Each structure stands twice: as structure tokens, then as C-alpha cells.
Amino acid sequence: MFPLAKNALSRLRVQSIQQAVARQIHQKRAPDFHDKYGNAVLASGATFCVAVWVYMATQIGIEWNPSPVGRVTPKEWREQ
């Protein structure tokens, strides 16, 4: 008896899920904020971040730890 009841319940669940999916497919939903402005917000945020990094890297005057090769001369070795 248990397998029969289990099978009946699983079929009921599957049918209810299928009905819910069918209702959602046929239902016309209005576009939300992300549908309307999602790509524009993403593009403007990426542009802003790139602009800030470019400004910071070129205009602020941060010393970016360049290589000392060719600019540093070694001192003479002193033996004691």
C-alpha cells in the first residue's frame, strides 16, 4: 500500500508543478527594474570604475615602485 500512496502523491506534486509552470508561461509579466535598466546600470558602473582607476593611476602621482635597475649603483665593498 505504501508504494501506491507514494506514487500517487508524487504524481500530484508533478501535476501541480506543471500547472504552476504553465500559468507562469502564459502570464504576461511587466518588466521590472532589472529588465529595464540592468545593462545600463552594469555598463555605467563598469565605466565609472575604469575611469576612477585610470585617474588614480595617471593623475594622483602615486610612486608605483619602479625597478631600480640602472639607477642604483652599488657601494664599494669594505673589508675590515
Swiss-Prot record:
GO terms for cellular component: mitochondrial inner membrane; mitochondrion; respiratory chain complex IV. Residues 1-24 form a transit peptide. It is a single-pass membrane protein. Residues 60-80 are mitochondrial intermembrane. Component of the cytochrome c oxidase, the last enzyme in the mitochondrial electron transport chain which drives oxidative phosphorylation. The respiratory chain contains 3 multisubunit complexes succinate dehydrogenase (complex II, CII), ubiquinol-cytochrome c oxidoreductase (cytochrome b-c1 complex, complex III, CIII) and cytochrome c oxidase (complex IV, CIV), that cooperate to transfer electrons derived from NADH and succinate to molecular oxygen, creating an electrochemical gradient over the inner membrane that drives transmembrane transport and the ATP synthase. Its main location: mitochondrion. Belongs to the cytochrome c oxidase VIIb family. It is found in: Mitochondrion inner membrane. Keywords: Membrane, Mitochondrion, Mitochondrion inner membrane, Transit peptide, Transmembrane, Transmembrane helix. Component of the cytochrome c oxidase (complex IV, CIV), a multisubunit enzyme composed of 14 subunits. The complex is composed of a catalytic core of 3 subunits MT-CO1, MT-CO2 and MT-CO3, encoded in the mitochondrial DNA, and 11 supernumerary subunits COX4I1 (or COX4I2), COX5A, COX5B, COX6A2 (or COX6A1), COX6B1 (or COX6B2), COX6C, COX7A1 (or COX7A2), COX7B, COX7C, COX8B and NDUFA4, which are encoded in the nuclear genome. It comes from the Eukaryota. Gene3D superfamilies: Cytochrome C Oxidase, chain K. The chain crosses the membrane at residues 33-59. Residues 25-32 are mitochondrial matrix. Pfam families: COX7B. GO terms for biological process: central nervous system development; mitochondrial electron transport, cytochrome c to oxygen. Pathway: Energy metabolism; oxidative phosphorylation. This is Cytochrome c oxidase subunit 7B, mitochondrial.
